A protein has these predicted regions:
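Recognition helix of helix-turn-helix DNA-binding domains
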Residues: 182-215
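Receiver (REC) domain active-site loop signature in two-component systems and cognate sites
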Residues: 81
């Protein structure tokens, strides 16, 4: 595989802007990894032909060494490659916290491998040779999945930020209120007066921007389970 396949210059926006300019973009970036240079080139050119930004690599090791911008998008990975396989790369990316959707390509109808990949979070598993439209449809679906994932992550991050700004008692009141408990029930559970509960509740609602019980429930449910589990009544 030619070294040029691993260079950042492989990424281009329609206006021909640089990799650094593209890094700040919200445009999807499709990352192609295939040890066959002809296939790698063909996939790259197909993506560029429909106005998608793309970068290509000849091996999983080259991808892991490359500094890539944090942009929505997906991976297109060949399953069987020398060294680190596509499935092993999937595990490595998950360990690094990279949740971009993965589309796997394979020349084999390997059902167990397909099941393993899909269970680990792959969004599609296509058999080579892949029809252009089938691949583009899979990429479009993967981009939608990633945009949804990123939006959910942003909501969760904001919820955690607001939650961490609450006092311990306010966090307890939030959990209880989101569970449907009345002020007097919360007061009994926490061993404090109902007036104190109302004060904590008012302060908590102001901090998280909640006006109704529905807002409280949404704020609580938007928190990741490990964060919710930290709060005991």
């Amino acid at each position: 595989v030619e070294a040029a396949l691993t260079q950042p210059e492989a990424i281009r926006t329609p206006t021909g802007s640089s990799f650094e300019d593209a890094a700040a973009s919200d445009r999807p970036l499709i990352i192609v990894v295939d040890d066959d240079p002809d296939i790698c080139d063909a996939l790259y050119e197909l993506l560029r032909s429909v106005d998608l930004d793309a970068v290509r690599f000849g091996s999983t090791q080259e991808l892991l060494r490359a500094p890539l911008p944090d942009r929505p998008g997906c991976f297109i990975l060949d399953v069987r490659m020398p060294g680190l396989s596509g499935l092993e790369l999937q595990s490595r990316l998950a360990g690094k916290g990279d949740g971009k959707p993965i589309i796997f390509l394979t020349g084999y109808g390997d059902v167990p491998m397909t099941v393993q990949a899909m269970k680990a979070g792959a969004v599609d598993f296509l058999i080579k040779p892949v029809r252009d439209q089938a691949l583009l449809d899979a990429v479009a679906a993967a981009i939608d999945v990633d945009r949804g994932r990123r939006a959910s992550a942003a909501v969760a991050a904001r919820a955690i930020e607001q939650f961490d700004a609450l006092t311990r008692r306010e966090q307890q009141v939030l959990r209880a209120a989101a569970a449907g408990m009345l002020n007097k029930q919360i007061a009994f559970e926490l061993g404090i007066s109902e007036v104190t509960v109302k004060l904590h509740r008012g302060s908590m609602m102001k901090k998280i921007g909640a006006r109704t019980i529905a807002d409280l429930v949404r704020a609580w449910e938007s928190l990741p389970a490990p964060v919710r589990d930290r709060v005991a009544i």
